[in-house]
Amino acid sequence: MKASEMARPPMRPGNPHAFASPATTPSRTASPNNAQGANVRTTQGGNQAGASEQQQPLDCFVVYELFASAVTALVSFFLVKDCGAVALNYRTFVSKVEPQQEEGKIVTDLDRLYWLTSVHVHWFSSGTLLVSTSTERTLALQCLGDLSEDEQQKLVDRCIRVAPNAMLASISSFDDPRQLSADDSNRRTSKKKAKMDSLEQNIEKWRMSVQRWLSRRGYSLPNLDKNSAWVTIRVGQLAQFPAMSPHLPTSARDVLWPRSLCFMQSLVPDDLKWFEVPGSAGFRDPIDAAQDWFTGQLERDKILDMQRKAKKAEEDAMRRKDEAPGLYPSSPFTARTGVYGDLQPVSGVYPTPPDGIVPGTGISSTDTPSVSGTASNVVLVPGGNTPAINLSAPQDYTTTDNQQHASTSPTFPAPLEPFQTSGEDDDLFEDMEGDGFGGPDVEEADFDFFDGPDGDDVNMADAPALPETTNKPHKQLNNDVAMAHEEEHSVKEEMSDPLAALESALAAPYRPINDGMPEEKVSEKEAKAVVPVEALATSPAQIKQNPPAKKEATPPLSPSAIAKTLQPSPPKKQSSFPASLQRTNSAFHSLDFSRRLSLVDAKYQDGRFAARIEKTEDDESAVNPGRLKSLKDLPLLNKLRYAVASASTAKSTEALSLARAVSDDSASDSESETSDMSEGSPEDPVDTHPLPYLGRLIIPAKRKLPTEGHGTPLSVTSFAESLAGDWQDSNSLLLDESSLTFFEPNTWDWSIPDLSMEPPEEKPLNGKESIAVTQILTDQIVSATLDLLDENALVESTSSIEPSSETRWQICIKELFPKAAECTLSALIAIHDVFPDLSAQAKGQQRPPPRKPNESNAIPSNHMYPMNPPFIRVRRAETHWDLLPPSIAFWEPLGLAPASPPKNVVAFCIYPHSASLRPILDRFMLNLQLAYDTCKLGSHARVETVIEYEGGLVPVKANSQTSAKEAFRALKDTCIQLGKLLAIQYAQLGEQQDTKIDAFVVYMVDPFGNPAALWELCSAFWSLFQAYGQGPPGRSDPTPKPDLVLQIIPIKYLASFDVPVILDAATYVSLAREVYDRCPPSVASTDKTPLSIYKAPAFQLEESLPRNVQFKLLSEPPQDLLRENSYMHIAYAISLDGNWLTAAWSDSCGKSQAVVSYHLGTRVFGDIAKEIWQTTIEILQARRVQWRVCIAKSGPLDREELETWVLLITCPTQVNLFLTILTVIEDPPYKFTPTTPAPSNSSAQANTNTPGSTPQTGVSPDPTIGLTPAATPSADPAPDPAADPEARLIDVTDETWGIILAHRLHNSNSTNQFSPALISGLLVKRGITHATSNSIHHPIPDPLPGPITVAVNILWIGAVGSTWKRAAESRGTQY
């Protein structure tokens, strides 16, 4: 297929998608199978209405899209690989701005500045391939990889864009899933730990797959092996993409993705700091703060002096404390008289809690052996042979680092300063070396055995939290022995119903594990609890082959070890654990006591040191949320009864093992427990970790699940399956490699919506109120001279950056296409389309059109011509003057006045309550009043209404600094109060003024700094308007009320926390004219045939007279001959979300204009277009003349929209219309870069010999500034003042050129879609360049540095009307 065959393609098939929004609806069905993700359009040859049955062998639309997609993919790969850019979608890239130093200063704010680069591929019918790039700078993007840890925690659930396909997602977590699984595995059985290991392997496999997938697309992201380089995101609405695999889910799932490929909108600053509320001083003038700081020097010196003295006193106190003080006789450390001290009495073997009584030094009882060392941590009951009672309790609270503990606290061991740990072995007992008292044979585990919790205190990670007490033991000591016997009897009973048994087990109150058990079992269970998990995986044979290494010297022996050696140990039962497994690091065996010791404990448990907790009237289930009253409270009750009705019997074994794992294997019947363990398989690991957390199900200890003895396929398998949920499934982590197809680039819209505002808590607005608020918001933005959307920050931050940001992309493309030629402006204009010659029968005989008298030669189509700036009409000395736009800057010196009559207003200002902000607003309102009066716009007065609103300043007082919702609610209440006040006192306010009040202007200060907050401000003004329109109840006043006008003032124009804000006079004058334009006309229009949308602006464009007046007889003569062939411009734009459409009407001079917003959420575009067209006809019927109507849309025009407009405008009307439908593209595929030629030697010599005031021979304007329209001859001895460029004051940044291209641009958002327009052209404005940025002041700067380019595509031309019906049928053209 040749490129020339695309010159006249066949009828393009209709768009398969119904119209929703051109910004959100792709023009073609997406298919992410190809490299560019849905760039290839499927062939739809058979869907054409009226097409011939014989199909062409090749579809030019498909061929064009395939070729353009391939070229775009190639360029994209190398831009990512060589330039380090990140592809946001198939042709849009984001990159970091490189810091550059210019004129001795480094540009700031570059850490937040990004480049957005778009690649455009255009294949012309002449065979020329044009690849271009356009780059914009933005501060609205922020990469997750550049965030700090503090900022990350605030961004959970925030909306982000995921590269490389710009998919919408939300941040789920910044934590590593493997760490979460590790924490979760501590509460699970060993089989679950195996699943956790599998999850870690799957996560690692997923990361490797993502790295390979990205490397094939040119990415080489650093530090992907670190956990900090990944983030867990939640991807939703996967059903919008075609299913690549049938087993992949379409619901929201979590995905691990690199942080450097995730972007979001920049964080908004704190918007409540301006309000003065309790606990916050609000705004403070930086000048006052500096003055207070200067005058407070003496006070600061006093404070510093006091701090130095206090620090010195503290150091002296610490130094005295460090000195060795004398020990009191009552101190337990007095027993340490020597290195080891004399033997002192020890009345027990277990440590006591910190609040226990330490026995004094003396002779011990005959039943208690004595040994030297620290005092035992026991409590002694008065009596000779009474054994000690251990009151140690588990520490169920979290200890902070700075918390102080007693010397006997289990958190910090008792200090051992007098002992020597140099490694020397001191033999205290000489003849007892054979009994195991050798120094090297004693290990730290011997002492940890007694320091750790006893059998009654087993740490369970998932046990319900016990109440914190300071000086009372726990509740577990109340009636333990009696309940223990009852439990032993109840556990042995068998129940016929497994559900009843499980319910009975769950309903029992939770108590310690070892209640009522003999001390022999306590020691064995404690030994099991301290065995690490790694030791369980080692066989006994391996332990025997690996003896412990040489041990270092340990502190002196414990009293319990000596007592155990001196006294014979009672016989103990054989355990299924090898001795090496139970205490691998200990040289001694565990101490086993007889049952009589427990009976003795029971005897003295109600002694003086017993703690009793009062019973509360509340239900125990409310105090202990971990215990459930009944199985009906369990969320998995249905699974226990019905879930596994179809489960096979083969699952019973696995379910039994799971149930046995979560049950306690240490019941009172120890013999049966030992036999069960011995009969188990040797491969089954022993459960030694804490009890698992099973949702809300808490399995009490010391009980066997009834399902273990009464297991059936229904009861056992359902219980096992309900507890065997995998971490991966429960957290919806998507680790399937085939899911990477969801991240393929596509042609969907990638604009980031602003979701930072919280939804209002109040009742939402209805449809009419929403449209009214939108209308108010539209009026504020369309005619704003202040920076409401914070767009000037981008211009200020990029003003000193190098103008050419396309160099790096051009170098990469040149290396990719070595034979490609660099495109210049003249070369671009010369690119033309090839039109095949039509047959002679269809073409017929062509005759050149007759030339008119005095007509010059035809202008070629590929021509660039300058467009002179229009004149502006103002009033001076009661006469209308037409001046050039630069004269507006000299409004006051020239004594200019608005072209329309003056408008008198009364002003009020709503601001956040702050004592420091009020005087600033007072000065601001005074300066604005002076500017309004100086420009002769009318009167701008402030009146006294109530005491609270002195000087027209209305404060918004917030009760508390909680959230933005509270501030918006306070603002709305203040507006309602002001509206009611104006409705009552507007007549009195009019009597106070000498002139008639045309409008009440409400200045509303915007302290939020967020564009999304503008909606809330306009909504509050709508509440004010409603309260003002209703008026006082029970009274109707026929006097017309003045209109209400809103003017939003960003807070940055008033005050700042850092520097004083001082506005220049030009800003006040521009704002005064803006307020004038917002007010309605004070008098009616003086035109002969006025339009219904008369606006009465401060100045307007000149009304040019017609070149000729046709004096001829017509059946319908025009009403106004001087206004024949008048223009009416209709422009509209659709929001990115497709919910709103804003249309604007304006005549050629701007005297009559209007802006209206429509809601597309519940209506189709055809209904909105019909309403816009009917409104247009009503406006034009007021003036029966020949109208030229231009319907323009911002952005590409879909085929359905074009067909709708053509259907509407071709209907006969009573007005003669000549219509043109066109599109305006603000970001065209072409971006111009001005070149600066080097000056020649001859011109340099001429400049040195010529005075600076003499005009030089050259071109005008200066070529060093930018583009040059044409050359001008040298100065003539008798120059014409009208032709002299220096005779007029011209703003060089406002110069504009029109370019008519010889080729056609595509009417599409996609660079791969073949959709040529009828005629294409460019509008190029010089704009602010580096040569003019410092010499010309612009109150309203351009959004981007110049040259600024706008593309215009004409799609349809025709004429309709009573006298143009035939012309419409013959001249109407549709592509």
Swiss-Prot record:
Spell out the Polar residues composition-biased ranges: 22-51, 397-411, 1233-1259
Coiled-coil regions, chain positions: 182-216, 297-324
Q: Which stretches are tagged as biased composition: Acidic residues?
A: 666-685
> Which InterPro entries does the protein's record reference?
Med13_C, Mediator_complx_sub13, Mediator_Med13_N, MID_MedPIWI
Per its UniProt record, what Pfam families does this chain match? Med13_C (PF06333), Med13_N (PF11597), MID_MedPIWI (PF18296)
- Biased region (Basic and acidic residues) positions are 313-324
Q: Where is this region: Disordered?
A: 1-51, 313-333, 350-370, 397-417, 537-581, 660-689, 841-862, 1233-1285
A molecular function annotated in GO for this UniProt entry is: transcription coactivator activity
Record localization: Nucleus
A Gene Ontology biological process noted in the UniProt record is: positive regulation of transcription by RNA polymerase II
Q: What are the UniProt keywords, alphabetically? A: Activator, Coiled coil, Nucleus, Repressor, Transcription, Transcription regulation
Subunit comment: Component of the SRB8-11 complex, which itself associates with the Mediator complex.
Give the function comment from the record: Component of the SRB8-11 complex. The SRB8-11 complex is a regulatory module of the Mediator complex which is itself involved in regulation of basal and activated RNA polymerase II-dependent transcription. The SRB8-11 complex may be involved in the transcriptional repression of a subset of genes regulated by Mediator. It may inhibit the association of the Mediator complex with RNA polymerase II to form the holoenzyme complex.
Stated family: Belongs to the Mediator complex subunit 13 family.
> What is the official name of this protein in its record?
Mediator of RNA polymerase II transcription subunit 13
Say which species the protein is native to.
Answer: Phaeosphaeria nodorum (strain SN15 / ATCC MYA-4574 / FGSC 10173) (Glume blotch fungus)
Q: What is the lineage of its organism?
A: Eukaryota, Fungi, Dikarya, Ascomycota, Pezizomycotina
